[in-house]
Amino acid sequence: MKAPSWRRAVLKVGSALIAPDETGVSTKYLLPIARFINECRERGQEVVLVSSGSVAAGRKHFNFEHKKVPVAVRKAMSAVGQNEMMGYWSRFFDSPCAQLLMTHSDLRDRARYVSIKNTLNRLLEHDILPVVNENDALATDEMKVGDNDNLSAMIATLVDADALFICSDIDGLYDSDPNLNPDAKKIPVVEQIDESIYSLAGGSVSSVGTGGMRTKVEAAEKATSHGIDTYIVNGRKGETFESLLQGDIPGTLFRRQSDPISNKKHWLRHTLVAQGEILVDEGAEKALIENGASLLSSGIVDVQGDFDRGDAVLVRSANDTDAIAKGICQYSAHELMHIKGQQTEDIAEKFGYSPITEVIHRDDLMILEDS
């Protein structure tokens, strides 16, 4: 079985390949990856590199023997390690490399999201290799994506990539844990990601990075829902990249969905973090799901959480615990508590101001039912 062709790809390199023994950057696994990227670019294909490993690369400069390191020291490790890591990547390519460090808050803000997209597109147009990483030196917990598997999926969506390659020290997805079962079989192709696939993912098998197989499956779900074929491959094996260049599938391919969601809907669903919930009645639920309507104040039963205008919220039926939609709210939680259940035309008369007609406009709403 041959791999689907692609024009633009995101390639994520895990910490276990950057600094396998945590004594600084090693070229052992990076050179074959760099050769693969060079070959792809010579063929006219575009690549965005998402490179983990700044903390692992910088660890050698600090006197910490154990894995548990204070947060402030990890940030310092990241600061020095990122510089070393970029130095290596820059030496591997004839054309320039560009460093982009970002946090989840950069991706959650729509204006910054679009700005990052434009910057990446301009870099690719000028044959410059973008090297992306999370800004571990500055990010706080609430600002972090948390792992570069999911970050790579967000970047792949942002640049409208055709393929996402997640390179780690894992051969792919298996039908059971290969560390426990010597007869475990690798799954070459996954057509649909569901709970059965997540049940196979288990936990992390890398001693260096923050992501395991589950985060890779999460990333694959994000990417495939936007029409991006996603591969999990072993970057420690040089033959992996020879196989990819020949159009073969050396790891596990998660096939793109045939009906991908739009870039904005994907951003709503997978990037924005919900700050509260809006409970709606049966009439509003039906209007949202069956008619693709906007959410109006008259259908709101209750409001939970403390959110501001422009925040993302979940919408769920007052009779169920499962969320039915996610969207950007045009009112704060405090404002909604005063207008919930009110007809739009009654709000102006009662409160003395002309209201925004839609609490959540349908263009800012993503239905989650059956997701």
Curated annotation (Swiss-Prot):
Pathway: Amino-acid biosynthesis; L-proline biosynthesis; L-glutamate 5-semialdehyde from L-glutamate: step 1/2. ATP binds at residues 12, 168-169, 210-216. Its main location: cytoplasm. The keyword Cytoplasm applies. It comes from the Bacteria. SUPFAM superfamilies: Carbamate kinase-like, PUA domain-like. GO terms for cellular component: cytosol. Keywords: Amino-acid biosynthesis, ATP-binding, Cytoplasm, Kinase, Nucleotide-binding, Proline biosynthesis, Transferase. Substrate binds at residues 52, 136, 148. It catalyses: L-glutamate + ATP = L-glutamyl 5-phosphate + ADP. SMART domains: PUA. Its EC number is 2.7.2.11. Residues 275-354 form the PUA domain. Gene3D superfamilies: Acetylglutamate kinase-like, PUA domain. It is an enzyme of class 2 (transferase). Catalyzes the transfer of a phosphate group to glutamate to form L-glutamate 5-phosphate. This is Glutamate 5-kinase. It comes from Idiomarina loihiensis (strain ATCC BAA-735 / DSM 15497 / L2-TR).
